[in-house]
């Protein structure tokens, strides 16, 4: 396990938890004073009441909850969202409603999950030529159905 410091921005905020021993993500909950309705085909920025600190060897990814996606067409808009190790502000989640019905978020609702992920930094080396591959410049759909 890797230590992550977490700060509740209000005493009423509930800390994220792993729901099972095999879960890779902790559920994030909305921390809002009043319910938020997300209209179809729109998004809303949902606060969690939490801020965190962790090693620069990691990032935290914010990902959708599969149950919200399959049951309500709700997802995290910028999936995965990235929380950098040097960010100290409140974690907020952009929730998007792909569905045709309003979606109501209440205080304490589980809205997304956060996963701690290792970061491998790149060292760029500029070149005028790249090695050849069989695929070459074949892009979208080039490898088949």
Q: Locations of the language-model features?
A:
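DUTPase catalytic domain/fold
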Residues: 1-145
